[in-house]
Amino acid sequence: VVLDTREGATYVGRFHEETAGGMLLHDAAGFDPAAGGSRDEFLRRTAKFGVRIDHRSILVPSAEVAGLVPFGDLKL
């Protein structure tokens, strides 16, 4: 899945579950806009080469989630 946060970060990973604490992803790669580059380029690179795992597990608080879509539904 692709999870976008309200702060502009994007995560690509395996959706595990929604808990009281937020959305739990496993084997996720993260994009931070402050680090430079573009979200679209990050997603194109991930589609081409696969997920570069930055986080074995990451819990994103529900209040920070701006969107969640299946990776295959993206138009790259």
Which residues are covered by each model-predicted region?
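Conserved RNA-binding domains used in RNP assembly and mRNA/RNA metabolism
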Residues: V1-L76
